Amino acid sequence: MGQKFSIKCKKQSKNKNTSKCQKIPKKAYEGPPGSYMVKAKYKYAASGDTDISFEEKEIMYVLEQFDEFWLKVVKQKDNKEGLVPSNYVSKQDGSPQSVEAWREIQRWEAEKSLMKIGLQKGTYIIRPSRKENSYALSVRDFDEKKKICIVKHFQIKTLQDEKGISYSVNIRNFPNILTLIQFYEKNGIGNTHIPLTDPMPDNYQPPVHFQDIEINRENIEILNEIGRGFFGSVHRAKWGRSYEVAAKMLQSSKAEREKFVLEAKIMHKLRHRKIVELLGVCTEPQDMPMLIIVEYMKNGSLKEYLKTPDGKKTNLNQMVHMMAEISEGMAYLESEKVVHRDLRADNILVANDLTRKVADFGLTELTDGSLGDQEKKTLRFPYKWTAPEAAKSKVFTSKSDVWSYGIVMFEILTWASSPYPDIPAKEVIEKVSKGYRMPNPEKFITGVCCPDEIYKIMIWCWDANPEKRPTFLVLQEKMDLLIVDTLTNNAYYSHSK
């Protein structure tokens, strides 16, 4: 629906029959009563009878919240009604989250993105800030003296009074974020008056969450096998008409299926950009393998990636970024009381944009980590990654995951070398229980660089007392600080215009 006009005419004089007509714009269409406007962040192709397709930037009006992950909308351009995934649209309410430039990322990720070759000066991102009641505007600039690209950050304060919410940069106030952007597009920002040009291109497309945890098997087309492990085989698959997913095939009894579905309903609600999200399960018919449907990561595991020609070029700064992404995903799981139990480079997957995501936590229990007596007898675990107290008691906690994270750090620093290379797997638990710890890997693996500040974090993760180990939130903060240090030194990101 475009903007409508009415014709208003008035006579120019009482002696003339001619009149002057003006087009007077009517009030912009605001959608059905009780609805609110959203704009599509991505293109979407419908996969069933109840959802509808739409184009990027298309305007729709939300009629109701259908469930936790889907909205019922009517499209502005053709009045079609149907369901759309809520994470594919943004509410047009003047907030930072409503504009194209919004990214749910940290400062170092904004700097990494904005320093990519080919972007013009003034490319920008709006993101969360660690400062209270604030957001951040990150802008690409060019230092003419040093001849390097840099990123500048500006605080956007949120103000609230009887008139509502407004936003402030320095001492200038704006009624909404769009007005703020338009002002700095025209006038420039900062001491050097950098004009905002374009939002940072967004190559990430989030997974589409199924409307129900239980998926009709007929809607899943199994394609080629891409992996096999202790829990079963993993296949590339297609959901509906166009969406690639990964399907894990598990053989299980009826009782095991019922138990897993209960756990899956909890895991289905876990949403974070640094974890591989569980999209649904297929448990029927009973005589066929159970399917666990998750995001498809075409680059495979981090272990596989580090062994590729591109992976072998990974430098120390990039390795620290990997560690930071994993700690962020694990910090989220920790906050949700989820214990992984099998954190390894094999269970970190690499997305299309090379983002690293924590995977396979969905095959673990979600409570306090305790198992039944019979389960403890048959439980298998990777000796070289498992904390000694967990190996002995079969009780896994977030702190035993932290131990495993220290081993993952070793894997990353050594391009996926096997930990404890000279010790048989079944002897590792006994040796570490007696106080043995792997030395700094740069001392026994050629070409490895592991600064003392990184090795100290590894040793901290391997403290014999679980309570003295850091939390994942603390580890995330430590990794962020390491990245900020490297950025300050221009060790990785500086390049010519």
Curated annotation (Swiss-Prot):
- Give one GO term, molecular function aspect: non-membrane spanning protein tyrosine kinase activity
Q: Where is this region: Disordered?
A: 1-25
Protein name listed in UniProt: Tyrosine-protein kinase SPK-1
Per UniProt, residues of the SH3 domain are 33-94
Keywords on record: ATP-binding, Kinase, Nucleotide-binding, Phosphoprotein, SH2 domain, SH3 domain, Transferase, Tyrosine-protein kinase
Q: Which organism's genome codes for this protein?
A: Girardia tigrina (Planarian)
Reactions the enzyme catalyzes? L-tyrosyl-[protein] + ATP = O-phospho-L-tyrosyl-[protein] + ADP + H(+)
Q: Which family does it belong to?
A: Belongs to the protein kinase superfamily. Tyr protein kinase family.
Q: Which residues cross the membrane?
A: none
Pfam name, any one? SH2
Q: Say if the entry is tagged with keyword ATP-binding.
A: yes
Which segments constitute the SH2 domain?
100-200
InterPro entries per record: Kinase-like_dom_sf (IPR011009), Non-receptor_tyrosine_kinases (IPR050198), Prot_kinase_dom (IPR000719), Protein_kinase_ATP_BS (IPR017441), Ser-Thr/Tyr_kinase_cat_dom (IPR001245), SH2 (IPR000980), SH2_dom_sf (IPR036860), SH3-like_dom_sf (IPR036028)
- Enzyme Commission number(s) of this protein: 2.7.10.2
Q: Which residues bind ATP?
A: I226, G227, R228, G229, F230, F231, G232, S233, V234, K248
Which EC class heads this enzyme's classification? Answer: transferase
* Domain named Protein kinase: residues: 220-482
Q: Which residues form the active site?
A: D342
